[in-house]
């Protein structure tokens, strides 16, 4: 059995982990983008004065939400890496150098992060429209129709790329210091 066959078998066996990480990334980018699309929409910025206190409070809430989403992404990545250490330990025990294991892991991580981020950005506009439609059922505000706040999409893409780069670097550093004994010891510890 070659290393590629072992890697494919481990991915199939642990596809739930990849799915959870993918859904976490997609959810984080979707929420950031949808909130930004609504907040920076001309339908909102025309009603709320951009220098007014209500708009500044809304921007502050958006900033806190983005901070929470970044923390959520770090947490999801740490849980994913904790469970990936078993696979990484298998490859290290087979004699693969840590650099090769890191390269293989980064390839998988890049694929998951790219796929999930694109889906999150694409779905943020329909999700923002659904929220807008739901809100207009209860509010009598009908002067404007739904418009896209492109700054929100830009911020979501910026957070997506920044989080990808930081998490990839964090994972690379932790994998380059990986040791089979530490991995075996950490697998017996509880979270």
What are the roles of these predicted feature ranges?
Residues 1-19, 83-86, 97, 132-152, ...:
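Feature of multi-pass inner-membrane transport and sensor proteins
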Residues 1-70:
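Membrane transport/envelope proteins' first extracytoplasmic loop
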Residues 27-41, 75-79, 111-140, 151-177:
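Small-residue-rich transmembrane alpha-helices
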Residues 90-91, 104, 143:
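Short alpha-helical segment immediately N-terminal to, or the first helix within
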Residues 74-90:
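Transmembrane helix boundary and interhelical loop/hinge segments in multi-pass membrane proteins
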């Amino acid at each position: 059995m070659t290393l590629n066959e072992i890697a494919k078998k481990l991915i199939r066996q642990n596809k739930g982990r990849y799915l959870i990480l993918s859904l976490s990334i997609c959810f984080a980018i979707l929420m950031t983008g949808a909130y930004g699309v609504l907040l920076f929409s001309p339908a909102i910025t025309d009603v709320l004065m951009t220098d007014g206190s209500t708009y500044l409070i809304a921007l502050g809430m958006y900033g806190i939400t983005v901070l929470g989403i970044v923390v959520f992404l770090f947490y999801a990545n740490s849980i994913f890496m904790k469970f990936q250490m078993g696979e990484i330990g298998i490859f290290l025990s087979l004699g693969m150098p840590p650099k090769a294991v890191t390269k293989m892991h980064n390839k998988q991580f890049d694929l998951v992060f790219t796929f999930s981020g694109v889906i999150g950005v694409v779905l943020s506009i329909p999700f923002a429209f659904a929220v807008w439609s739901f809100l207009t059922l209860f509010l009598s505000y009908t002067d404007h129709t739904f418009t896209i706040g492109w700054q929100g999409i830009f911020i979501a893409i910026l957070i997506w790329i920044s989080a990808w780069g930081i998490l990839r670097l964090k994972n690379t550093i932790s994998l380059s210091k990986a040791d089979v004994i530490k991995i075996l010891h950490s697998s017996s510890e509880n979270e």
